[in-house]
Amino acid sequence: MATALSLAAVTACGGTGSGASDPNSVTVYSADGLGTWYETQFEAFTEQTGITVNYVEGGSGEVLSRAEKERSNPQMDVLITLPPFIQRADDQKLLAPTKDADGSTDANYVALANNYFAMIRGTGVAPAPQTWNDLLDPRFAQKLQYSTPGQAGDGTAMLLLLQHVMGEQQGLDYLGALQANNVGPPASTGKLGPKVAKGELSVANSDVQMALAAIAADKAAYEVFFPAGADGVRTTVALPYFMGQAASAPHAANAGKLIDFLMSVPVQQTLAEQVYGTSPRADVNATGPQAAAITKALDGVTIWEPDWTAVNARFDALIDAYNQATGQ
């Protein structure tokens, strides 16, 4: 969870602008990870429509929290975040029917880009950890960190994955044991990659899209891995970026135009090349070296897709149990 939200329209989209008071603008609240893609696409959207995009970035739970606090004075037009936070937003009546790629408005949010939970390890860490049990090794004391379940999408995914792989109580017990090595709650998942790259950390959590994009752009000295369970199986969680139109959007028409634009085939086709994401659209197939890197990263990994509505229904109990198990 970021300690502060940065409210700034992407420079290419016309500056910080006039926000919700400008009828020719649209305000997006988004979890971090897609910033470079947004910069390119928001600029193209502004050139095409004349609508300025004001962009607010934060942790997955933080952008939702901001929207909740602004309920009496809505500023947000579009929310983009990871599960289960988009489901929580829907449950709290913060979202309106949102058009999907087929033009249907049966749901209040749509998948914008596919993504998957991952761990990252420094390229100089030897021997490289391969299993969840390896991460309990004392050599990782104060050299391991993960984002906070209940506040970060990737951190929440890690909790759910461990309970899925090990069993509900066993997963909690594991996280309790992992506290001996854990540095503590970070500002956000996005803050962890640079720490691993610099050697301040040996291991951290991340996701495939964010990690591969950073490795390519910054030559970050870490690599993606998926720890194996006791049975030797490597498993990840499908963790899409979801997008929904705000129920009280100050610029509902502009929000609809931006959603249509981002879900269009030409824009969806840029996900892999520009930011190592893949499209949820059945009629968009990623190709090229970036798509190959995504496929290679996930080779041999079992992808688990939780019932996010069910997760949301027991969200508070899950986080309470986590806090109790880890003494937080």
Predicted regions and their residues:
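C-terminal motif of bacterial Sec signal peptides marking the signal peptidase cleavage site
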Residues: 8-12
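Bacterial signal peptide processing site
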Residues: 14-17
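A ligand-binding cleft/hinge motif common to bilobed small-molecule-binding domains
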Residues: 83-91, 202-223, 275-276
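A bilobed periplasmic-binding-protein/Venus flytrap-type ligand-binding module shared by bacterial periplasmic
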Residues: 118-125, 160, 238-252, 270-274
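An extracytoplasmic/periplasmic, membrane-proximal ligand-sensing/linker region
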Residues: 169-170, 277-328
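Mature extracytoplasmic/periplasmic domains
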Residues: 246-302
